[in-house]
């Protein structure tokens, strides 16, 4: 048993979708979350920038004595997961493999769509992961760069959001039966995405799927937390504390969250 917290990292608020599912499925666990909102979105960034920024967040979480790191960010997972895993002696998990595996199980027509940031689509990690498991599946990938900005600005229910989602997803409508939400920001737009794609299309939340793998790793390494009466979940953001708080408290349905501003660039010294 291990009562140290689980660390989650993301380029902003998107990883809160993973945090919500983690708190629901694993209620005994404490979390420390870092969102690099100041440098979001990561999608247009170069591979070198994404690696450097991810190490900033990883080292920040290590300073909080976490027992596991969850890359609650598809872009970071695509670009840095294997690099970070090789360097650390604690478990590190990403969100791409769990999402891809679930989509393979759910599709009935062998036509899967993937929507993600530009960097994730460029990496082709979802396509490669699915191809390794099943050569019969056709994967249609689509970058939706505007979605992250909508979520980070807390405009998920606006008319602009409806129009952007509808226009962005038009190339996939009628062509797939399963759609991977390949960015942890995207579940915050789930209702609009479902409305656009049609109720017959199954939406796969890659972050939520990852929590099942987190549970397996906790058991395997015997680092589950004891049941406890008090929890101190800590959330950090590199910019926009008030906006982050508004989104986090609404999405997690938890009031009075412990949210602080964090400077993380100095945590990159050794990498």
UniProtKB/Swiss-Prot annotation:
Keywords tagged on the record: Cell shape, Cell wall biogenesis/degradation, Isomerase, Peptidoglycan synthesis
Catalytic activity: L-glutamate = D-glutamate
Organism name: Lactococcus lactis subsp. cremoris (strain SK11)
Chain's role: Provides the (R)-glutamate required for cell wall biosynthesis.
Family classification: Belongs to the aspartate/glutamate racemases family.
GO MF, one example: glutamate racemase activity
Pfam families reported for this sequence: Asp_Glu_race
Protein name: Glutamate racemase
GO BP term (any one): regulation of cell shape
InterPro entries in the record: Asp/Glu/hydantoin_racemase (IPR015942), Asp/Glu_race (IPR001920), Asp/Glu_racemase_AS_1 (IPR018187), Asp/Glu_racemase_AS_2 (IPR033134), Glu_race (IPR004391)
Top-level EC class: isomerase
Classification via PROSITE patterns: ASP_GLU_RACEMASE_1, ASP_GLU_RACEMASE_2
Active site: 73 (proton donor/acceptor), 183 (proton donor/acceptor)
């Amino acid at each position: 048993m291990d009562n140290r917290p689980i660390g989650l990292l993301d380029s902003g608020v998107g990883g809160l979708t993973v945090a919500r599912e983690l708190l629901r499925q694993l209620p005994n666990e404490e979390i420390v979350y870092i969102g690099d909102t100041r440098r979001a979105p990561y999608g247009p960034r170069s591979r070198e920038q994404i690696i450097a920024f991810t190490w900033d967040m990883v080292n920040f979480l290590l300073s909080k004595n976490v027992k596991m790191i969850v890359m609650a960010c598809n872009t970071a997972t695509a670009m840095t997961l294997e690099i970070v895993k090789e360097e650390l002696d604690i478990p590190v998990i990403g969100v791409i493999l769990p999402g891809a595996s679930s989509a393979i199980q759910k599709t009935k027509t062998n036509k899967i769509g993937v929507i993600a940031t530009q960097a994730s689509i460029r990496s082709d990690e979802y396509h490669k992961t699915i191809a390794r498991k099943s050569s019969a599946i056709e994967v249609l990938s689509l970058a939706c760069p505007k979605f992250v900005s909508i979520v980070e600005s807390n405009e998920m229910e606006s008319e602009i959001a409806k129009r952007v989602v509808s226009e962005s997803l038009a190339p996939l409508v009628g062509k797939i039966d399963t759609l991977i939400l390949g960015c942890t920001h995207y579940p915050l737009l789930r209702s609009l995405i479902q409305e656009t794609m049609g109720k017959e299309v199954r939406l796969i939340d890659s972050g939520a799927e990852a929590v099942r793998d987190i549970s397996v790793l906790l058991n395997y390494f015997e680092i589950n937390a004891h049941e406890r009466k008090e929890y101190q979940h800590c959330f950090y953001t590199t910019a926009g504390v008030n906006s982050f708080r508004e989104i986090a408290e609404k999405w997690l349905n938890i009031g009075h969250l412990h949210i602080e501003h964090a400077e993380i660039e100095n945590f990159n010294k050794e990498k």
